[in-house]
Design a protein with these regions (language model features):
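Juxtamembrane/disordered regions of integral membrane proteins
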Residues: 1-275
């Protein structure tokens, strides 16, 4: 237990170090800084960042331990999964629903974070031993069905993501819409429903691209995949950011956390059933 805690602590430090390095590099490039709705108390922000980093490290450690392949394979799979969500998809979402800005800076910073934490995770936590390469696992994965079957199933997964998003997001929208309509806490509503559909379709493609390498390298049961992937998705797609958004009231963050948890678990189980 003590050894595990020590490893998680080191992974958290690597995440923080990657964030700091990415932030300094982004600043040196002169990228636009985010404009938070109120001045940040850096001490409080640091506490929340450290706590959220621990959660990310714990989630990724469990994910990495279920992956087959060598360390380089697991590093690439984990780093891409983290960056696809924390560097790309979350930035797209923030651009649509917030006025904070700084999405390019965040994308660059998250690249450093993703590489740093993924490196620490695969060095400190062993994966499942596998005598095959990722390329052979990839061929085996897609050999299970015909091209027509894969086309249909992948299309359903891409379409399912926006549907899941709206199923759980619409009830939450009824609860928190006033905050978005009044531009409270740096929030805003998208310009139109059509724009929102387009954005979620783009995010759906990145979500699938982030999940496929994990499915290929996965060496546990499908049931375990549904839970492990779903919880990891919850962490990287929302919990990490919501834990640090301390300027928002707890009620708002809690409602969105429940929404994202249901989104993520449902999407994880859809992947399990369809792919």
């Amino acid at each position: 237990m003590i050894k595990y805690i020590g490893k998680i602590f080191l992974c958290t430090l690597s995440l923080v170090a990657g964030t700091m390095a990415g932030g300094m590099f982004s600043t040196a490039l002169g990228l636009e800084q985010p404009k938070f709705p109120e001045p940040l108390d850096m001490r409080v922000f640091g506490y929340y960042a450290l706590a959220s980093g621990v959660v990310v490290a714990m989630a990724l450690a469990e994910l990495s331990r279920r992956l087959g392949g060598n360390r380089w394979t697991r590093f690439a799979v984990v780093a891409w999964f983290v960056y696809a969500w924390m560097g790309i998809n979350n930035g797209i979402e923030a651009h649509v629903f917030t006025t904070i800005g700084g999405e390019t800076l965040s994308a660059v910073t998250m690249l450093f974070l993703s590489l740093s934490v993924a490196g620490a995770i695969v060095l400190l936590f062993n994966g499942r031993k596998s005598g095959t390469t990722f390329s052979s696992d990839l061929r085996q994965f897609f050999a299970n069905r015909t091209s027509a079957q894969w086309t249909l199933r992948l299309s359903v997964v891409v379409l399912a993501f926006p549907i899941v998003y709206f199923v759980f997001g619409m009830p939450v929208g009824l609860i928190v819409s006033d905050s978005y309509r009044n531009h409270e806490f740096g929030l805003r509503l998208p310009s139109s429903l059509l724009a929102l559909l387009g954005v979620q379709s783009i995010r759906s493609i990145f979500a699938l691209l982030a999940a496929l390498p994990i499915l290929v390298a996965w060496s546990g049961s499908r049931r375990r995949f549904g839970w492990t992937f779903g919880l990891n998705l919850f962490v990287v797609s929302g919990l990490y950011g919501l834990m640090q958004a301390f300027w928002m009231p707890w009620t708002l963050r809690s409602v969105h956390s429940v929404e994202l948890l249901l989104d993520s678990l449902t999407y994880g189980w859809l992947l399990t059933a369809l792919l």
